[in-house]
Amino acid sequence: MEHRCGKKLFEKTEIVSHEYAGADCYCLTVRLPRMMEVPELPRAGQFYMISLHDKSHILPRPISLHSFDEKQGTLSFVYRPIGAGTQELTQYRAGESLAIQGPLGNGFMIPSAGSCHIIAGGGIGLAPLPQLIRAIRCKQPEARIIFFAGGRDRHIQELIDFFALPADIELVLCTDDGSLGINGFVPDVLSAYIEKCRNSGNLCADIAMIYACGPTAMLNKIRAFSQSAQLPCQLSLERRMACGVRACMGCSIQTAAGVKKVCADGPVFDSLLFPHELP
């Protein structure tokens, strides 16, 4: 499928803003001049390859889409600097140019059936989920959305505040150290919440989907729970990528349907493709 901002070539953008988003994360916003000219918008869960100025970093960095503004022609990326490449990225300023490629991969699919959407994110895996919430709201304005958001400590609140989430979603915060919200990990809190609500009849029975993005350990637990509870689930995987366009084998992963490439077949997959633990 050809996507709205082009899939094969890097395109020059201008950095509109670059700000601290909280919880050791930054938000980079760029303007893509031809965003209004082509036929398909990016989807929540897709990603872009970002080319760095320092060409000693030969490979571009894959970063998931945080949000986009069609009218302004802007794309935003929330990321956490971990390696040398993303550390360099923090130094870029408004007015500078930046080459990006995308949108790439397959994003989240929002089913038409079902009235309750359950979203789970942990750490930097929270970044693409606000756009997913907006997409669900656009497709199903009356849908119930329950958002389980987890982080190491209370500083995750900074990121949640930065997201400016819709007031009508149900937000369940949890932290590893118990300094904010529920003391626990997202998969445990999510599964306990659903089971409790199911038993009391307070959760709408018509669950459309569980959407999850975060560390592999978190995804494995949610995968196992969704399968045991017979609930539909999509997982957004994070893997190291060299090309982003299926040209190499760097992000290959074994699934029930054979070997898939996370960059092109994913990063979002149906959890049923993984009957066993994710590697």
Q: Which positions does each model-derived feature cover?
A:
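Short Fe-S-cluster ligation motifs
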Residues: 3, 158-159, 260-279
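Ferredoxin-reductase
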Residues: 2-94
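Short, Lys/Arg- and Gly-enriched loop/turn segments at beta-strand edges
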Residues: 56-63, 105-113, 263
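Local cysteine-cluster metal-coordination motifs and their immediate loop/turn environment
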Residues: 216-217, 238-267
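FNR/FR-type flavoprotein reductase catalytic core
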Residues: 84-235
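Short gly/pro/ser/thr-enriched loop/turn and capping motifs at secondary-structure boundaries
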Residues: 154-155, 179-180, 240-244, 269
